[in-house]
Amino acid sequence: AEPEDLSGTLRLLLVAGIHAGEIEGKDAGIMLLRDLTNNEGHRWPFPGTSLAFVPIFNLDGHERSSRFNRINQNGPDNMGWRGTSQRYNLNRDFLKADTPEMRALLGLWNQFDPHLVYDSHTTDGADYQYDLTWHLEQFDLLDAGLRKWQRRFFED
């Protein structure tokens, strides 16, 4: 769809596989799409909502699979490499956009203009108390405007 065709819709962007050793989001996203479209008539079950999904953001790292990558992680036996083929950690490239992967993602982001971006990092097999965890930036390090926004949406 063209961007103008999406005006008036709630737009969600799902990004998986930013670190190839944390690839569960790719599998979960593909399963989600399967379940959302595997209904009678294959109709999208959420009218007024558009979804863009990047299943493997770090393709170089995903394809560089080895049992010697991330040896301190609790499984799986083989996993991809954390960085790109140029050894960039894409998680640290959002501002500078040095990598072609990040420039492509930011192009999609700017064109799609999502209301919500879900970056599906995963743990290394640790057993956490909660099914879903999230992280907010350290309050005292934020710009005053961001502090106000964070307090309004997440803390009040």
Where do the model's predicted regions map?
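Active-site/substrate-binding loop(s) of hydrolase catalytic cores
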Residues: 6-18, 22-155
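Conserved beta-strand/loop block within the catalytic cores
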Residues: 1-2
